[in-house]
UniProtKB/Swiss-Prot annotation:
GO terms for biological process: CTP biosynthetic process; GTP biosynthetic process; UTP biosynthetic process. Major role in the synthesis of nucleoside triphosphates other than ATP. The ATP gamma phosphate is transferred to the NDP beta phosphate via a ping-pong mechanism, using a phosphorylated active-site intermediate. It is found in: Cytoplasm. SUPFAM superfamilies: Nucleoside diphosphate kinase, NDK (SSF54919). Homotetramer. Its EC number is 2.7.4.6. GO terms for cellular component: cytoplasm. This is Nucleoside diphosphate kinase. Its cofactor is Mg(2+). The gene is ndk. It comes from the Bacteria. It comes from Bacillus cereus (strain ATCC 14579 / DSM 31 / CCUG 7414 / JCM 2152 / NBRC 15305 / NCIMB 9373 / NCTC 2599 / NRRL B-3711). Signal peptide: none annotated. InterPro entries: NDK-like_dom, NDK-like_dom_sf, Nucleoside_diP_kinase, Nucleoside_diP_kinase_AS.
């Protein structure tokens, strides 16, 4: 089953959106298989944002993601990567549709509440950065037979 990595960023944690975000993905029918509240270190941030290392905003990305706790999650389900991207909304909150997480709660590009993997490959890489294999729980959810 497909997995994706999602992270409530420091602004989303401080604004108390963890429960709202988890509820949206559960109501959609996805299965939470890993989650933790954590402080991102500069080393982890560097790995996570490696593709932006040469860009002028790299330092700002690292500073922000390390500025407070984040809530890291792994979700599982059919089409979860693409569906999660749609549920999050466009990166720029003012362009995100109402009803999406960023459309409802985002204010600026820098503080847009949530990060989500943009492909299966990114999901695999990001899950490996933030979670050890033993931190992911594979279990049967009775609801799945009603969804898939």
């Amino acid at each position: 089953m497909e997995k994706t990595f999602l992270m409530v960023k420091p602004d989303g944690v401080q604004r108390a959106f963890i429960g709202e975000i988890v509820a949206r993905f559960e109501k959609k029918g996805f299965q939470l298989v890993g989650a933790k509240l954590m402080q991102v270190t500069p080393e982890i941030a560097g790995q996570h944002y490696a593709e932006h290392k040469e860009k002028p905003f790299f330092g700002e990305l690292v500073d922000f993601i390390t500025s407070g706790p984040v809530f890291a999650m792994v979700w599982q389900g059919e089409g979860v990567v693409d569906t999660a991207r749609n549920m999050m909304g466009k990166t720029r909150p003012h362009e995100a549709a109402p009803g999406t997480i960023r459309g409802d709660f985002g204010v600026t590009v820098a503080k847009n509440i949530i990060h989500g993997s943009d492909s299966l490959e990114s999901a695999e890489r990001e899950i490996a950065i933030f979670f050890k294999e033993e931190e992911l729980v594979d279990y049967s959810k009775l609801m799945n037979e009603w969804i898939y």
